């Protein structure tokens, strides 16, 4: 029988989520809950979960207790001191100084709303979120030759409203696209602007389009989901003349940034760096794809999306293969992508950048802010491995990288000192 560590690791790789409910002291009396892909839930799967329930509950309870030890939690810090940027923020701030007036780091979102919209309550709800999350009323200035966060105690957002009701449907859609493009290309001033903008287009009395734009230095993909979810909750409550039902946040992003600076040093930093220096030793390859046009001397970030669909039959075959090999769909497709890149470049040493949410602490799960990190996943196709052999190598590399995801990409670049070329990302060319 597999050890509890091995068993739970296997479930994790199969995208099975486990949690414990109940306050009973006995492991047997607590409820073990799970969420898993439909194809994973078999009679054998359920039987083994029941058989190992007691040791699973005990293990998860011990992990939960260790996570919530008081000395390990992030604590609020005084706002009377200069507040440092997180490592990710500092890198983004530096890039902004190199290219002032850029809109490259804008995060856009567009939502079409149908039905009655109480605009005054909608605006009030937006401002409640800004009041709730300090990071949304934070600016970034240079003080004594280093950037710091400056939190405004009173920032108010005004919705930019445009009425398009006088246009026909075709003209409206063209105008929506044009205005959305203009909004996306409009830069923020990190030192002075509120780093969130909202534009409301009225198409009819019961149809609206909302543009929401944030600067990446205060937000990420996970944060946008939090924002939309909280907006819906608060707006619903306000429409019913009820106060916001959301609990007060125990910490803010600035607390995380200060904690990260203090925590990621000494032995912790050395342990993380040791892994990545070993994984990325030697000359790092440059993936030169056979593009139609010469590569620009400086990255312009001007690109396009190409979407395609995989048939249901092939999708099921991929799922079956991933289950057979004990890997997630992501890892299987990552291996396939690396093989495809090998085919087009002939390069055996393949590096791909992979973004991760980096929300591996309970207290930051509900915060808006710039937490995302990028992992550098390096694999080698030398020795003519079979697909299954290479797939297992990719799996090992990926999970090992997840175990060392606390080192910010910015810190990794700083310590590796890669040869810089403005036409390429410093460590990888495919993300």
Residue ranges with predicted function:
Residues 34-38, 111-115, 163-166, 214, ...:
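Short beta-strand-to-loop capping motifs
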Residues 57-61, 70-158, 167-263, 267, ...:
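Acyl-group handoff/entry surfaces in thioester-processing enzymes
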Residues 79, 99-107, 134-135, 144, ...:
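His-Asp-centered acyl/peptidyl-transfer active-site segments
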Residues 40-43, 154-160:
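Short, charged/polar, Gly/Pro-enriched secondary-structure boundary elements
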Residues 24-33, 144-148, 156, 205-209, ...:
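A generic structural signal for beta-strand entry/edge sites
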Residues 1-68, 148:
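Non-catalytic accessory regions
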Residues 301-315:
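DNA breakage-rejoining catalytic core of tyrosine-based enzymes
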